[in-house]
Amino acid sequence: MESNGVPMITLSSGIRMPALGMGTVETMEKGTEREKLAFLNAIEVGYRHFDTAAAYQSEECLGEAIAEALQLGLIKSRDELFITSKLWCADAHADLVLPALQNSLRNLKLEYLDLYLIHHPVSLKPGKLVNEIPKDHILPMDYKSVWAAMEECQTLGFTRAIGVSNFSCKKLQELMATAKIPPVVNQVEMSPTLHQKNLREYCKANNIMITAHSVLGAIGAPWGSNAVMDSKVLHQIAVARGKSVAQVSMRWVYQQGASLVVKSFNEARMKENLKIFDSELTAEDMEKISEIPQSRTSSADFLLSPTGPFKTEEEFWDEKD
């Protein structure tokens, strides 16, 4: 366990990752001094795992915060941090994977990543990030060649490990059929209102660590939901345990054997989020949470197309499998 109280998880490749990380998606302060200071503050209060992506447009501010943290002595070495970034869909082509990773490294001012993930199981026509993706730009991903390029990134030392995000069991099976280096992580939505039981069991059987996003319902994001934070079941457990609803939700995820990333720019909540490892939910608590109605918050609508690989949410998530 780290000095900040966050347990370390050993991934199937042997590298160690903090069980809790700070997410950097959908900030209202993109590219601002406030965003950089929030990341710097997170390092100061004890966060050592940061989750970013090319699509989040937060890499540069995070890189500046890391550089400043080193200058201030908040950390002695970049090696104290675990940095995850993600390959955007427009770069999910065999010849663009390595250049995309190298661009992320330039943004972050780092020599290597700890973990590089394929952001979504779909490709787009090459090009810059756009607010609205034209439907005719959505393409099927060649898992074999794209994953081989991800493997090359690891072999060359630009990332210590590779994984995926938003992959279903079916899509993981297809990718792993030709993989030489298996994915160590699958980052997906998971919370008391989306248990992901089948996917968790599949990933556990294949030594893939689930990292949960949207643990609190992604409140504030366009696709967000209040279902977690307004849950009467979670509220009752929180009162009984002397914890917040957020802490109960996060603790539930951790007790399922998953790691997690959460986002807050509020210092008090940053500190609160770190304090989920000092007590356990009881078997009775877990049973109550198992009965919470299930629904998905994340939407893949922006990656659906009548002419693309996935025409419906059900096809994208393989929810009818």
UniProtKB/Swiss-Prot annotation:
Positions annotated as active site in the UniProt record: 56 (proton donor), 119 (proton donor)
Consequence of gene disruption: Plants silenced for all codeinone reductase proteins accumulate the precursor alkaloid (S)-reticuline at the expense of morphine, codeine, oripavine and thebaine.
Binding, NADPH: 27, 51, 165, 187, 214, 216, 264, 269
Catalytic activity: codeine + NADP(+) = codeinone + NADPH + H(+); neopine + NADP(+) = neopinone + NADPH + H(+); morphine + NADP(+) = morphinone + NADPH + H(+); neomorphine + NADP(+) = neomorphinone + NADPH + H(+)
PROSITE patterns linked to this entry: ALDOKETO_REDUCTASE_1, ALDOKETO_REDUCTASE_2, ALDOKETO_REDUCTASE_3
Site description Lowers pKa of active site Tyr, residues in chain: 86
GO MF assignments: codeinone reductase (NADPH) activity; oxidoreductase activity
Segments of this protein annotated with the region Disordered: 299-321
Positions of disulphide bridges: none
Biotechnological relevance of this protein: In yeast (Saccharomyces cerevisiae) engineered to produce opiate alkaloids, the expression of COR proteins leads to the accumulation of neopine and neomorphine as major products.
CDD domains listed in its UniProt record: AKR_AKR4A_4B (cd19124)
Enzyme class (EC, first level): oxidoreductase
Expressed in which tissues: Latex secreting cells (laticifer cells). Expressed constitutively in all organs with highest levels in capsules. Restricted to the parietal region of sieve elements adjacent or proximal to laticifers in roots, stems, leaves and carpels.
InterPro entries per the UniProt record, alphabetical: AKR (IPR020471), AKR4A/B (IPR044497), Aldo/ket_reductase_CS (IPR018170), NADP_OxRdtase_dom (IPR023210), NADP_OxRdtase_dom_sf (IPR036812)
Coiled-coil portions: none
UniProt-annotated binding residues for substrate: 119
Temperature-related properties: Optimum temperature is 28 degrees Celsius for reduction (forward reaction) and 30 degrees Celsius for reduction (reverse reaction).
Keyword NADP part of the UniProt annotation: yes
Influence of pH: Optimum pH is 6.8 for reduction (forward reaction) and 9.0 for oxidation (reverse reaction).
Gene3D superfamilies: NADP-dependent oxidoreductase domain
EC number(s) from the headed UniProt entry: 1.1.1.247
Known function: NADPH-dependent codeinone reductase involved in biosynthesis of morphinan-type benzylisoquinoline and opiate alkaloids natural products. Reduces codeinone to codeine in the penultimate step in morphine biosynthesis. Can use morphinone, hydrocodone and hydromorphone as substrate during reductive reaction with NADPH as cofactor, and morphine and dihydrocodeine as substrate during oxidative reaction with NADP as cofactor. Converts morphinone to morphine, and neomorphinone to neomorphine.
Protein name: NADPH-dependent codeinone reductase 1-2
Native species: Papaver somniferum (Opium poppy)
